[in-house]
Amino acid sequence: MLEAGIRGEQSVAVTSENTAKTMGSGTLDVFATPALVALAEKTCWMSVAAALDEGCGTVGTRLELEHSAPTPVGMTVTCESELTAVEGRKLVFKVSLHDEKGPVGGGVHELSLIHI
């Protein structure tokens, strides 16, 4: 059963494959914003995946995310999520992201439950 308070955590190493330069979102060898978005989304859906009924999944419907600091190759970015509200099919998460030096981003992500 999905209830507010469910938490998740995922980490990813910053490598040449997920930099702004490689992903086409900039010219620098730092963790790309698209990679930050993907990490936030993955952390949220994975935190609730085990509680979903068979044939049920989630899709992202809203994302408000700040990418506030660069993370260079060789460091790790960690995302922590908390399910803050369940409103019918809508799941609302608070996300915070950090690396070894401190905060690098945060915001709100919403998922919608769907039946496949």
Predicted regions and their residues:
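Catalytic strand-loop segment that frames the active site of acyl-thioester-processing enzymes
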Residues: 1-32
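Intrinsic-disorder/low-complexity, polar/charged segments enriched in Ser/Thr/Lys/Arg/Asp/Glu/Gln
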Residues: 3-9, 62, 76-78, 90-92, ...
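Generic structural detector for well-ordered beta-strands
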Residues: 11-14, 66, 110-112
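Short, residue-level hotspots on alpha-helical faces of the histone-fold
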Residues: 38-42, 46
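Hydrophobic beta-strand-centered segment that forms part of the acyl-chain substrate-binding groove
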Residues: 45-78
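Hydrophobic beta-sheet segments that form the core/acyl-binding groove
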Residues: 65-100
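C-terminal structural segments of small proteins and small subunits
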Residues: 97-107, 111
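Conserved small/polar residues in nucleotide/adenosyl-binding loops
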Residues: 114-116
